[in-house]
């Protein structure tokens, strides 16, 4: 799950086709959980520097269920889409934060995406 999400979020940042995976179609459906108009506000609330990736912990939004976890993935993907170039961004911190927030729901996410763990 971690590798899939890393590849997906990096792909959303620059659309590098070498990162593309058919599973991304399923993950892109999560975009509906975050309004495009909210992305600028979310970025502002993250107080990001030019080299930051999505810093979800700065949003102070708890992850209490699978829907919250899906929303965090969608926020990460949409913010990644709208921020600087991949090579300039410190992704490791962003992924550490994201996974710490949603790892409890990895099994549920796998079932939701694939129908099994």
Curated annotation (Swiss-Prot):
Coiled coil: none annotated. The gene is OPG035. Induction: Expressed in the early phase of the viral replicative cycle. Belongs to the poxviridae OPG035 family. It comes from the Viruses. GO terms for biological process: symbiont-mediated perturbation of host apoptosis; symbiont-mediated perturbation of host defense response; symbiont-mediated suppression of host NF-kappaB cascade. Bcl-2-like protein which contributes to virulence by preventing host NF-kappa-B activation in response to pro-inflammatory stimuli such as TNF-alpha or IL1B. Keywords: Early protein, Host-virus interaction, Inhibition of host NF-kappa-B by virus, Modulation of host cell apoptosis by virus, Viral immunoevasion. This is Protein OPG035.
């Amino acid at each position: 799950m971690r590798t899939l999400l890393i590849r997906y979020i990096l792909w959303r940042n620059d659309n590098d086709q070498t990162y593309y995976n058919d599973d991304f179609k399923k993950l892109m459906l999560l975009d509906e959980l975050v309004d495009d108009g909210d992305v600028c506000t979310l970025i502002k609330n993250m107080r990001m520097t030019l080299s930051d990736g999505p810093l979800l912990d700065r949003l102070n939004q708890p992850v209490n269920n699978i829907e919250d976890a899906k929303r965090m993935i969608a926020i990460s993907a949409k913010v990644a889409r709208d921020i600087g170039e991949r090579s300039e961004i410190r992704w490791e911190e962003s992924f550490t934060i994201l996974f710490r927030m949603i790892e409890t729901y990895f099994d549920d996410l796998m079932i939701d995406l694939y129908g099994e763990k």
